[in-house]
């Protein structure tokens, strides 16, 4: 998708469709200009209440041919009605407007469109013109996603390829361009994560993820990628990771990405993604119902790759390291058994009480590996526990941290992008649930506070740096009729990295 921001006249800009706005029952400048050319068509529609006053409502209009007209369709979009003078457009309005408009444009079989913003929002404050441009570009990108493997008429490719954001002056052009660039980059990153998440486990293997990282790095001089195999991990003493991958015919991979967009002396942020490309539960086998959704157990890894995709698109001025712990969790004669004791890279021993609590086993060695980068912060992202879904449902990711400033920054990023998280306790009181008679710790802590004890387990490997854990089990994918990966929390992560 190409986004262009420029100053233009609605009478002379060549495009298939012009998008104009109304607010408080009145046409905005470009809509009013179009109305004059169309002999009162738009004001007539307002007078008969053909468009709802609800923010995001829209009305398609077929335009009468004129001498100067270079477009045949118009889309009139409602910004909403203020109930009182102090009320204005809210962040929620911006999101609704953008989602509805993006969906409408992508389903209209248009090749291009032009959006006339007409200073619809102020340059400063919570709800700005840049925020509207950012959100609209992101939602247009998101609405354009089609799963690559699905064939047939139900998967018609999106036709919209170019959107012009039209400004009224040069300052507004810059504002719209900035908003469109960040929104489009985030949207591309989200879609990349969705695609990886949606791929079946027979295609998206640990090696496939490593190849995707390699391909992404090939297109950017600031990004490098490499992958460690099981022999290299064995030499590093990654017994926890290998206890998971050894049950599968697919070799486990520790995938490493380094994006160097800032000065070399600036400490990097590190993102650690759980990449269990299919999780059967191992010997502690999961029930058959809905097991197909365990292909989504690598959505943490997908979000890391999606975030790097966005950073590359933005040419971001930050240093970021990505570590993806990629493995399959399969039952076999070589798989780990309940009661096995393994030694992690940190030297701590773990009694594997349940082989279906495998995510923390691959992550703990990856978190230990992260120490070598002397990071500014480390954020791990994982579809870690069903207990988090019980606690928070499908709207907020669970957030745990050993450093409140990092937690606050992530919470703020989530609020700003509507990719929200909720901070959970990480108290020492929960640590004793991990006690083991045969090792330094067990890999599960019982049913009470299951998401918390999983985070407590990880915290034992993060003593040397500021760390946060995002449990995305409830937000990484949708089930049911709209089954599919969401691409979360790419927008949260990108916002966090750009602002910290």
Swiss-Prot record:
Keywords of this entry: Aminopeptidase, Cytoplasm, Hydrolase, Manganese, Metal-binding, Protease
Subcellular location: Cytoplasm
Cofactor(s) required, per the database record: Mn(2+)
Residues noted as binding Mn(2+) 1 in the record, renumbered to the chain: 279, 356, 358
Biological process according to GO: proteolysis
SUPFAM superfamilies, per database record: Macro domain-like, Zn-dependent exopeptidases
InterPro entries: Leucine_aapep/pepB, Macro_dom-like, Peptidase_M17_C, Peptidase_M17_leu_NH2_pept, Peptidase_M17_N
Cellular component terms (Gene Ontology): cytoplasm
Major localization class: cytoplasm
UniProt cross-references to Pfam families, sorted A to Z: Peptidase_M17, Peptidase_M17_N
Residues engaged in binding Mn(2+) 2: 274, 279, 297, 358
Record's cofactor remark: Binds 2 manganese ions per subunit.
MF term (GO), any: metalloaminopeptidase activity
Keyword Nucleus: no
Gene3D superfamilies listed in its UniProt record: Leucine Aminopeptidase, subunit E, domain 1, Zn peptidases
Family: Belongs to the peptidase M17 family.
Role: Presumably involved in the processing and regular turnover of intracellular proteins. Catalyzes the removal of unsubstituted N-terminal amino acids from various peptides.
HAMAP family named in the record: Cytosol_peptidase_M17
Official protein name in the record: Probable cytosol aminopeptidase
Source species of the chain: Saccharophagus degradans (strain 2-40 / ATCC 43961 / DSM 17024)
Gene: pepA
